[in-house]
Regions:
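Post-Walker A alpha-helix
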Residues: 38-39
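Hydrophobic anchor at the beta1->P-loop junction of P-loop NTPases
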Residues: 27
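Conserved nucleotide-sensing/catalytic segment adjacent to the nucleotide-binding pocket
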Residues: 43-97
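C-terminal accessory "lid"/substrate-recognition subdomains
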Residues: 2-10, 141-200
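Conserved glycine(s) of the Walker
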Residues: 34
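P-loop (Walker A) phosphate-binding loop of NTP-binding proteins
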Residues: 30
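A glycine- and Lys/Arg-enriched "phosphate-lid" helix/loop adjacent to the NTP-binding pocket
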Residues: 104-149, 159, 164-165
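Extreme N-terminal, non-catalytic leader segments
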Residues: 1-23, 57-67
Length: 200
């Protein structure tokens, strides 16, 4: 299913800034839903990508990227934010509000997948879910907990992508189609897609 929102009807109408301010994309969502693949895609699109940056440092990074003399790469930032704890996401939501109040142009991408798909991916990769602390939570319990942590952030997303039935290549293609030319356009449309991620 595809839903398209015009500029006046976007779920998040973030303000435009001066030409020296960077274009910022926040990549977040469920662990195992494709955040790393998304980060590599934005690297290919010429973004300077940062993984696991503490929310309290996001505005500092944006300020540095806004300084005169920055090259083109420094004008485009993609920041990956993953599961930590409830306080982490509370800080991230607060930082997004600060960014909007400061007039920073940014978009939030939330990547998701069905619980059964996420469980299968973790079992196939033999990796431990980041919220399976000392194996006190099963994978299913960790995923359920992560959903509760990310619920508010998901509601703030400009783009929601369900990767349950999508291959890594398909995810890359969709992100390129959505962001390769539109990120720098003023008055752009925001398109929300629901897809999937076939093999993790």
């Amino acid at each position: 299913m595809t839903q398209t929102f015009s500029n006046g009807d976007t779920p998040q109408d973030h303000s435009e800034t001066s030409s020296t301010a960077p274009d910022v994309v926040i990549i977040t969502g469920m662990s195992g839903a494709g955040r790393t693949e998304a980060m590599h895609t934005f690297e290919d699109l010429g973004y300077f990508c940062i993984d696991n940056l503490p929310p309290s440092l996001i505005m500092n990074m944006i300020s540095l990227a806004s300084l005169p003399g920055q090259n083109e790469i420094g004008r485009k930032l993609a920041i990956v934010c993953d599961a930590r704890n409830r306080e982490y996401f509370k800080q991230l939501v607060g930082e997004l509000a600060n960014m909007e109040a400061a007039g920073v142009t940014f978009r939030v991408i939330f990547l998701d997948a069905a619980d059964s798909i996420l469980i299968a991916r973790y079992k196939a990769s033999r990796r431990r879910h980041p919220l399976c602390i000392n194996n006190k939570r099963s994978i299913g319990q960790a995923i359920s907990y992560e959903r509760s942590l990310t619920q508010e952030l998901r509601s703030l997303a400009d783009s929601y992508i369900d990767t349950s039935n999508m291959s890594p290549r398909e995810l890359r293609e969709e992100l390129r189609r959505l962001y390769s030319k539109q990120t720098a356009k003023e008055g752009m449309n925001v398109t929300v897609y629901s897809f999937g991620f076939k093999h993790g």
